[in-house]
């Protein structure tokens, strides 16, 4: 008889839940709920379990916020809870709450070739460190290392490191944004809101008044080639993505590969392929050759957060991935 665990991927807007076959890691019965419709995460979980009529005693939920102890307060939502209390209330034997990019990193060993698009570099070196990052509402970052037959995720808040310009244009962008918001982190330019910041700074650098555009507007106009400013912003976004990815590769010697997740890049995939991303990734001066063979992959799996939550839980329960 198949034994299932509950897995989840929860952001500021939606909560996606599914079942994970503990033996195989296969994800099934995925369903997305609007967070605004429920008073708590526990309430959403109860609705899901009632709908699917499956006995579940183990669970792992990935959440887009730092996890530092028993009490979890979501960054972009009003939900807050005690992990121990929710575990008790649900009658679970085991409940893990992990960072969303911990989950994405743990999905990487489970991915197949059809879930990946490669952008340069050679083949990954087995057993070497891995980096994963992704732009969405914010900029998530994690590393993954293989130690004693186990995968160990190293999450953090790497999206909040300083934005490090490496061209005259980027330096002007930094100057304009610093005057507006003070500290300029990488997330301030590599995210949905970050794309808007790039567009606004590009226009303001020419002493013009920017339009009130959303990320979707900028992307659409750039792809339609109907707005030079939007196209410049999207091109610069791709270049800075490359620089940031190259920095991650240098930090930990990620010869196991650098992986891109998040919902933004797939929306302009062909544009990204033709952009200066890879050249910027390798633009490391004396260490250009060091990063030259490090492969970069775009993750195109539908549910990497669910897949990784399942992998994390299965490994915790003693399975070898």
From Swiss-Prot:
One GO CC term, this protein: cytosol
Binding site for ATP: 8-13
Chemical reaction(s) catalysed: D-glucose + ATP = D-glucose 6-phosphate + ADP + H(+)
Entries under SUPFAM superfamilies matching the protein: Actin-like ATPase domain (SSF53067)
Keywords recorded for this protein, A-Z: ATP-binding, Cytoplasm, Glycolysis, Kinase, Nucleotide-binding, Transferase
Localization, UniProt: Cytoplasm
A UniProt-annotated Pfam family: Glucokinase
Biological process annotations from GO: glycolytic process
Enzyme's top EC category: transferase
Keyword Repeat tagged: no
EC number(s) per entry: 2.7.1.2
InterPro entries on file: ATPase_NBD (IPR043129), Bacterial_glucokinase (IPR050201), Glucokinase (IPR003836)
GO molecular function, one term: D-glucose binding
NCBIfam families noted in UniProt: glk, PRK00292.1-1, PRK00292.1-3
PANTHER family: GLUCOKINASE
Family label: Belongs to the bacterial glucokinase family.
Name listed for the protein in its UniProt record: Glucokinase
Organism: Shigella flexneri
Encoding gene (name): glk
């Amino acid at each position: 008889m198949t034994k299932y665990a509950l897995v989840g991927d929860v952001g500021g807007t939606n909560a996606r839940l599914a079942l994970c076959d503990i033996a195989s890691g296969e994800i099934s019965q995925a369903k997305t709920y609007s967070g605004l419709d429920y008073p708590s995460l526990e309430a959403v979980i109860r609705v899901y379990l009632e709908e699917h009529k499956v006995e579940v005693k183990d669970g792992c939920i990935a959440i887009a916020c730092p996890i530092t102890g028993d009490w979890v307060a979501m960054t972009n939502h009003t939900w807050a809870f005690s992990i121990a209390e929710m575990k008790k209330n649900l009658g679970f034997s085991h409940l893990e709450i992990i960072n969303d990019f911990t989950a994405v990193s743990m999905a990487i060993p489970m991915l197949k070739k059809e879930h990946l698009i490669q952008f340069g570099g050679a083949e990954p070196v087995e057993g070497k460190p891995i980096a994963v990052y992704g732009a969405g509402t914010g900029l998530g970052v994690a590393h993954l290392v293989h130690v004693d037959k186990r995968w160990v995720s190293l999450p953090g808040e790497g999206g909040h490191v300083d934005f490090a310009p490496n061209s005259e244009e980027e330096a002007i962008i930094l100057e304009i944004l610093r005057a507006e918001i003070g500290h300029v982190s990488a997330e301030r330019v590599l995210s949905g809101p970050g794309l808007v910041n790039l567009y606004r700074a590009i226009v303001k650098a020419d002493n013009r008044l920017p339009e009130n555009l959303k990320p979707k507007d900028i992307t659409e106009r750039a792809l339609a080639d109907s707005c030079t400013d939007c196209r410049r912003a999207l091109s610069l976004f791709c270049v800075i993505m490359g620089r940031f990815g190259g920095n991650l590769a240098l930090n930990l010697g990620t010869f196991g590969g650098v992986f891109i997740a998040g919902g933004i890049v797939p929306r302009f995939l062909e544009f990204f392929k033709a952009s200066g991303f890879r050249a910027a990734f390798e633009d490391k001066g004396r260490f250009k050759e060091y990063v030259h063979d490090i492969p970069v992959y775009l993750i195109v799996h539908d549910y990497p957060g669910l897949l990784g939550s399942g992998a994390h839980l299965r490994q915790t329960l003693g399975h070898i991935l």
